[in-house]
A protein has these predicted regions:
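Helix-to-loop junction immediately C-terminal to a conserved catalytic motif
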Residues: 48
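Conserved ABC transporter NBD signature motif
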Residues: 53-72
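Q-loop/switch helix immediately C-terminal to the Walker
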Residues: 82, 87-103
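Conserved ABC ATPase "signature" region
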Residues: 96, 108-123
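Hydrophobic anchor residue at the start of the ABC signature
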Residues: 141, 180
């Protein structure tokens, strides 16, 4: 279970949100909505243990995220709103390198198959600088097929995706939740999921 208790995020002297509480159980998705600058990315970084909350507590399986550290990171897959890809490397090279850094090495043939599922057949060996924004987003999201983690935290994963890719991602998230995973997602767009979905809106 992922739990936020009385969370607050500050930007300078301004409070983005305060006294925010929620629980996400196994098989559930927390869908976070809000305008630009409302604190969605700040919230996700708190939940991922990357930045501490200005106030409040984040717990994973009953323990504070800041205390778990490496144990928590082994169960987390965080995709920020930036792709994190190296422009000069191919899609395959980026994902192979990322899997090594995550201590879950995978063969290039497995990566190629994941990229095919992401709709990138024929573009796997191109430098990512030659790919469109939507294709770069698909490369980044293909990590979901390669790294087996219980908790997915996805910041604006639908950005630049076409309708087909949005459906693919929704099916991927549903499959993850059916297998006992959890997900936290931010987006300006709606996302049709068959699984149990909790929606919160911040910055209002």
């Amino acid at each position: 279970m992922l739990e936020g208790i009385d969370l607050q995020a500050m930007r300078g002297e301004r409070s983005l949100f305060a006294r925010l509480s929620f629980q996400v159980e196994t098989g559930e998705c927390l869908f976070v909505q809000g305008e630009n600058g409302s604190g969605k990315t700040s919230l996700l970084r708190m939940l991922a243990g990357l930045t501490p909350p200005s106030a409040g507590i984040v717990r994973w399986k009953g323990s504070r995220v800041q205390q778990l550290r490496d144990e928590f990171r082994r169960e987390l897959l965080y995709c920020g709103h930036l792709s994190g890809l190296k422009d000069e490397l191919s899609a395959i090279e980026n994902l192979v390198a990322g899997a090594l850094l995550a201590a879950q090495p995978v063969a290039s043939c497995v990566v190629r198959q994941a990229l095919h599922q992401a709709g990138l057949q024929g573009r796997e060996d191109l430098p990512v600088r030659l790919l469109s924004q939507g294709q770069r987003r698909r490369v980044s999201l293909a990590r979901l097929l390669l790294q087996r983690r219980a908790l997915w935290i996805l910041d604006e994963p639908l950005a630049a995706l076409d309708a087909q890719a949005v459906r693919w991602l929704a099916e991927l998230v549903d499959s993850h939740l059916r297998s006992g995973g959890l997900a936290v997602i931010t987006s300006h767009q709606d996302m049709a999921l068959a699984s149990r979905l909790h929606v919160i809106r911040i910055g209002v």
